Swiss-Prot record:
Protein name, UniProt field: Glyceraldehyde-3-phosphate dehydrogenase, cytosolic
Note: Plants contain two types of GAPDH: cytosolic forms which participate in glycolysis and chloroplast forms which participate in photosynthesis. All the forms are encoded by distinct genes.
Primary gene name: GAPC
PROSITE patterns named in the record: GAPDH
Site (Activates thiol group during catalysis): 182
SMART domains the record matches: Gp_dh_N (SM00846)
Organism, scientific name: Ranunculus acris (Meadow buttercup)
Amino-acid positions noted as binding D-glyceraldehyde 3-phosphate in the UniProt annotation, renumbered to this chain: 154-156, 185, 214-215, 237
Length: 338
């Protein structure tokens, strides 16, 4: 595939808008279309330009050309408002890759509707029950060009998997438990409200620490089969708007001091996993990672070892920006695999 990779985005929520920001700031991809049936173009412009967490968009002047076109500088982006994915005419815009970021069409069958509109490939920006999951830096090289629908897994899996890979490759993981202290997301409630499937999840997000389930740790077993059945985990939703942190407690096959583990992670962060896995010895807190495009930043000072076989590791992630960056990275990798 030559030239810029043309992408479309279905669903202009948190991840959809940030994938757009990432794409527009890069020179190897081109945003050509956005679909969202619930947002007008003028409101879309406002939501894109002003962001409470990531700040005001200042790269290009942004304006509405007409009700079906946005202008990023001189670059037109077509806007659709279709509720049914198969009705979105991606082919008219040349969109080869579609980012499915509504959170609704997350199965292969549902996401395949985009192919009927002319898209060549679909990347689901969420875990999927049946689409193959790829985590950049972990198993993305296993992607084959005949796979049309993929999942970029979850933000937490993208944080955990690179860390788990390094530890398992170097020392072996017997078993482990993960806890993610996770920033609140759009699915939560501003004040106590109905949430019949998750009673605790219906409590006020800004005033509570809320225990929650997550499939992120088990999903690591899908991208790293050697760890299948060895990891599980849970989440605490906390009253912050962005940046989350994983605590991974593992029992090791090979004895290793905490210094050995730090050295291994540092080496990988400067080698094969550079740009994916980070390493810091600074006295950091969550807001220090807003806008960090790495998937996982290991906090060397925060971890602890019980002994040479049992250790707790801590790694930060901007659950919005880092994840959105990987969505685009995965698209670029897929295009090169054609």
């Amino acid at each position: 595939m030559t030239g810029k990779i043309k992408i479309g985005i279905n669903g202009f929520g948190r991840i959809g808008r940030l994938v757009a920001r990432v794409a527009l700031a890069r020179d190897d991809v081109e945003l050509v279309a956005v679909n969202d049936p619930f947002i007008t173009t003028d409101y879309m412009t406002y939501m894109f330009k002003y962001d409470t967490v990531h700040g005001q968009w200042k790269h290009h002047e942004l304006k509405v050309k007409d009700e079906k076109t946005l202008l990023f500088g001189e670059k037109p982006v077509t806007v659709f408002g279709c509720r049914n994915p198969e009705e979105i005419p991606w082919g008219e815009t040349g969109a080869e890759f579609v980012v499915e970021s509504t959170g609704v069409f997350t199965t292969k069958e549902k996401a395949s509707a985009h192919l009927k509109g002319g898209a060549k490939k679909v990347v689901i920006s969420a875990p999927s029950a049946d689409a193959p999951m790829f985590v950049v830096g972990v198993n993305h090289t296993e992607y084959k060009s005949d796979i049309d629908i993929v999942s970029n897994a979850s933000c937490t899996t993208n944080c955990l998997a690179p860390l788990a890979k390094v530890i398992n490759d170097r020392f072996g993981i017997v078993e482990g438990l993960m806890t993610t202290v996770h920033a609140m997301t759009a699915t939560q409630k501003t004040v106590d409200g109905p949430s019949s499937k998750d009673w605790r999840g219906g409590r006020a997000a800004s005033f509570n620490i809320i225990p929650s389930s997550t499939g992120a740790a088990k999903a690591v077993g899908k991208v790293l089969p050697a760890l299948n059945g060895k990891l599980t985990g849970m989440a605490f939703r906390v009253p912050t708007v962005d940046v989350s942190v994983v605590g991974l407690t593992v029992r090791l096959e090979k004895k290793a001091t905490y210094a050995d583990i730090k050295a291994a992670i540092k080496e990988e962060s400067e080698g094969k996993l550079k740009g994916i896995l980070g390493y810091t010895e600074d006295d950091v807190v969550s807001t220090d990672f807003i806008g960090d495009n790495r998937s996982s930043i290991f906090d060397a000072k925060a971890g602890i070892a019980l002994n040479d076989n049992c250790v707790k590791l801590v790694s930060w992630y901007d659950n919005e920006w880092g994840y959105s960056s990987r969505v685009v990275d995965l698209i670029v990798h897929m295009s090169k695999t054609q």
